[in-house]
Amino acid sequence: MTQEEVPLPAGAVLRPVGAEQWGVVAWLWQAFRHDLSPVVGGLPYADGRYGAAPLQPFPSPDGTGYLAWRPHPNTGEDAPVGFVLVGGLASDRRTVAAFWIAPPLRRSGLGTALALAVLERHPGPWEIGFQHDNPSAGAFWRRVADAAFGSGGWVETEEPVPGRPHVPPDHFIRSLA
């Protein structure tokens, strides 16, 4: 294991996304958007893929990514089982721009450990957004915020979605330190 790697539950390891691995993130982005589609009403475009424009700012001085890897059960080779995109690195407040864990590994502790490891890698104030109609994400991020920032070390706000007055407001968790 290298200095860049962090061991995670479920036999996984956290690694920064390498230059040659952004294509892997783009494939996982499709799974992320598929999972989110019932919440945001998202549909694939004519080519069968979900929009990936939010990936354009990555990588950059302001944004980076991390992959969770573990041996594939059928082949034993390392396979990606989750990712996190972090924005705001050149700003005063870091953001979780996207977060996804493969469904079979959800509720294994992997997601919480991955989130906490990434938050720890980038000290400073954080902002984590999630959709009002995604109560599982809300419960998850509130637990992570308590673990990362301490009870009372964060606030949650609701804010209108820009340009979409017909949808419920988004929620944002912001650390106080």
Regions found by a protein language model. Give the residues of each.
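Active-site rim helix/loop that mediates acceptor-substrate recognition in acyltransferases
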Residues: 33, 38-74
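A short beta-loop-alpha structural element at the N-terminal edge
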Residues: 12-27
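Residue-level recognition of the GNAT/N-acetyltransferase active site
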Residues: 97, 102, 106, 131
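Conserved GNAT acetyl-CoA-binding A-motif
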Residues: 121-136
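Conserved beta-strand in the GNAT
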Residues: 67, 77-88, 95, 100
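Conserved active-site tyrosine of GNAT-family acetyltransferases
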Residues: 141, 145
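C-terminal "cap" of GNAT-fold acetyltransferases
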Residues: 132-134, 147-177
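Conserved acetyl-CoA-binding loop-helix of GNAT-fold acetyltransferases
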Residues: 101, 107-120
